[in-house]
């Protein structure tokens, strides 16, 4: 079956060839399609021809399986014990490939990918919309060799005029609604895909408040125009980044010629930061003397992680420290009228709040 055999044939051909001189470029069309041009690779594996030759060698009139069947029935000689070896058929490299052709023929591959999940519960529709919208804006980003990619430059300002809605975000250390709330989740997803690829990240900011759903010290916050996420392509070939949004997740994948970087991480110890404060908010609709915690307070803390990037030979290319300092979360206590200042909360857990993840 060609569909089943093709991945194995392409993988074998890739192992046999020398990709040291291979580089690719990407060309985007207005209709969203991507064309690929390859340099340093003159041939592509022809899976269909290879499968046909293999089929003939195994099941043809003189094939090994046919001979074995005839021998079992008392006719002919026993087939040779050596395995059947068929060279991979090759053809000339087209001047231009579609993205899918380049992927199927092993000219390019997805060499780093990262996925984060988000809530689809009641009240999150605006946030989901913003995540999907900014993902579309970032999708099919191309970074040339030696080039830089910027989240803010690529997406532009996140405003209502450009289709963004008001949703939960972290603003000045507190959870609030802001146009474009939620896009930081996409920034975090991109950052981790680039982090795992071993590509340089000259600019990255952590969120003001800690978000436990992300790897320790590996969140990324963006805010127009001050907070940006920037990464660089230090390879000899162009990199295409695809950002896709599913029903409850977003994925960033880097495509191109795999540089073969090996990435490891040293995670430091958490250190104590600033202590949290408590704020009382009077709600006249509550019964006198009652109180409840709206937002549970959390002390600030900080952490540093170190990424070590090595080449295929095991040589250290660079070590990168990413430090993150998270502010405390103010505890918000909602009280009814005439509640004494020293009264502790008496009812209700803190409400779930979702920030700019």
Where are these regions (language model features)?
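Short, surface-exposed ligand-recognition loops at beta-strand->loop->(often short) alpha-helix junctions
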Residues: 1-3
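Well-ordered beta-sheet/strand-loop patches within structured domains
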Residues: 6-7, 11-20, 24-31, 35, ...
């Amino acid at each position: 079956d060609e569909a089943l055999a093709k991945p194995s044939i392409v993988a074998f051909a890739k192992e046999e060839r020398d990709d040291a001189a291979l580089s690719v470029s990407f060309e985007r069309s207005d209709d969203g399609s991507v064309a690929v041009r390859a340099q340093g690779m003159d041939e592509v594996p022809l899976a269909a021809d290879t499968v046909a030759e293999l089929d003939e060698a195994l099941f043809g009139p003189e094939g090994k399986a046919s001979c074995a069947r005839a021998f079992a029935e008392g006719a002919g000689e026993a087939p040779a014990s050596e395995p059947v070896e068929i060279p991979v058929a090759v053809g000339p490299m087209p001047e231009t490939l579609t993205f899918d052709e380049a992927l199927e023929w092993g000219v390019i591959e997805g060499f780093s990918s990262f996925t984060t999940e988000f809530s689809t519960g009641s009240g999150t529709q605006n946030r989901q919309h913003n995540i999907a919208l900014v993902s579309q804006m970032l999708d099919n980003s191309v970074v040339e060799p030696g080039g830089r990619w910027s989240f803010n430059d690529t997406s532009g300002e996140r405003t209502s005029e450009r289709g963004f809605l008001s949703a939960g975000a972290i603003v000045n250390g507190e959870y609030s609604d802001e146009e474009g709330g939620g896009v930081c989740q996409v920034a975090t997803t991109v950052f981790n895909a680039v982090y795992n690829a071993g590509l340089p990240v000259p600019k990255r900011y952590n969120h003001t408040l800690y978000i436990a759903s992300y790897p320790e010290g590996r969140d990324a916050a963006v805010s127009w125009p001050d907070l940006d996420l920037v990464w660089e392509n230090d390879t000899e070939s162009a990199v295409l980044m695809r950002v896709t949004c599913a029903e409850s997740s977003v994925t960033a994948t880097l495509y191109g010629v795999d540089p073969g970087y090996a990435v490891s991480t040293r995670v430091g110890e958490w250190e104590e930061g600033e202590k949290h404060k408590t704020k009382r908010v009077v709600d006249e609709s509550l019964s006198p003397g009652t109180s409840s915690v709206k937002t549970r307070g959390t002390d600030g803390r900080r952490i540093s992680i170190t990424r070590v990037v090595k080449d295929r030979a095991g040589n250290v290319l660079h070590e990168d420290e990413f430090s993150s300092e998270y502010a405390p979360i103010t505890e918000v206590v909602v009280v009814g009228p005439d509640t004494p200042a020293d009264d502790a909360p008496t009812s209700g857990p803190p409400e779930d709040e979702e920030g700019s993840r």
